[in-house]
């Protein structure tokens, strides 16, 4: 998701994503926020796409900011601790992998749609957590 402070624009890249497409999406982005991204997302992108996101934008892993505030666990655990609810509470990381597999092996459009909806919700929740930890306008105080 890309937030300009006024709103959140969600861009989803999948299935044969090219480094150029991600580079275009990140063009002009100053800061990138992830949850456990320093351990998963960024190394995955660096390995698969040969793209160093941290060289393009300042990266903040909200997992560590959560830890400093006594919020431990995965993204869903932090959401629960903050009282956030999900529209898709039955979908978790394992189910996301299963949905991707169904899409890739059976060309299951419904599985892909559900996965993309789950990912959109992840991004929106992450933005909410970022705002709770950082505030709406200011620079992060990590």
Predicted regions and their residues:
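Conserved DEDDh/DEDDy metal-dependent 3′-5′ exonuclease domain
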Residues: 2-85
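Acidic, Mg2+-coordinating catalytic module of metal-dependent nucleases/exonucleases
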Residues: 79-142
């Amino acid at each position: 998701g890309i937030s300009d402070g006024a709103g959140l624009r969600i861009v989803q890249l999948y299935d044969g994503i090219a480094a150029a497409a991600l580079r275009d999406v990140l063009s002009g982005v100053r800061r990138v926020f992830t949850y456990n991204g320093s351990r998963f997302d960024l190394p995955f992108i660096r390995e698969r796409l040969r793209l160093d996101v941290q060289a393009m934008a300042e990266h903040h892993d909200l997992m560590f900011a959560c830890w400093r505030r006594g919020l431990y666990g995965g993204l869903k655990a932090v959401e629960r601790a903050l009282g956030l609810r999900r529209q898709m509470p039955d979908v978790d990381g394992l189910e996301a992998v299963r949905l991707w597999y169904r899409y890739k092996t059976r060309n299951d459009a419904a599985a892909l749609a559900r996965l993309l909806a789950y990912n959109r919700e992840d991004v929106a929740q992450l933005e909410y957590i970022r705002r709770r930890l950082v505030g709406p306008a200011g620079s992060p105080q990590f």
